[in-house]
Amino acid sequence: MKHILLTNDDGYDSVGLKALIDALSPIAKITVVAPANNKSACGHSLTLDKPLRLISIKDDFYKIDDGSPTDCIFLSLGNLFKEGFKPDLVISGINIGANMGEDITYSGTASAAMEAVIHKIPAIAISQVCQNRCQDIQNGWEFELAKDTIVKLATRILNNSFPLDERKFLNVNIPPIKPNECKGMKITKAGFREYGTDSDRHINPRGEEYYWIGLHPLIWKASEDQSCDFEAIKENYVSISPIKLDMTSYDDLKNLENWLNN
């Protein structure tokens, strides 16, 4: 039986992770290693300044005490899988909230997939786009479309092959709709966000300032060809983006060389 390693960045008790386990358990052996706490927007961070504990919750289900999603993949491969054996597929999610455009660089969900493909394991990051600061998700969202989508993708990969070369992964975003409202899956490029530096400033009872980041609405740039991830979501498509780890700007290598030498 094929073997899938699951993780996330919302924590081991997230409803999105539970939905992922429910969806994939019938088609593969599942091992879960997830952060003990919410690690949203932690990026591709690896914990180097303190020891980590791999804590067994039940059979094939572990949490890492204060670890990141990247820690989860790294420690899993070195300690839970016998030498010479790797999972057939790593899936990170189901994230509560979108991971589109440059958000991928902040995302713990996407970073777990990055870590997997560094170790030459096919990987998918899957995120559920939500509304109203994700209160719809927290209040009993069924993840029906997300579960349908991930089963289709995982089955195709496990029965055939991964469609991307090494050091590339699939970034999947699910619109906040029912399966019968979905127009299908669309292959997309990562879009662009209009980033600001807004934060919410407050004063605590001791008169000290504190700030919350990430409470303001997301604003996206429209693309001319309507082929980016957030536009697919807006049109009720599942967005599937191929993402590569090589961030070299090859178009600029020659120009940069000329700039440096002249």
From Swiss-Prot:
E.C. designation(s): 3.1.3.5
Chain ranges passing through the membrane: none
User: Gene Ontology terms, cellular component aspect?
Assistant: cytoplasm
- Asked if Nucleotide-binding is a keyword of the record, the answer is yes
Q: Is Transit peptide tagged as a keyword?
A: no
Primary location: cytoplasm
Where found in the cell? Cytoplasm
Taxonomically, which superkingdom? Bacteria
Q: Which cofactor does it need?
A: a divalent metal cation
- Name by which UniProt lists this protein: 5'-nucleotidase SurE
Organism, scientific name: Aliarcobacter butzleri (strain RM4018)
Its gene name is: surE
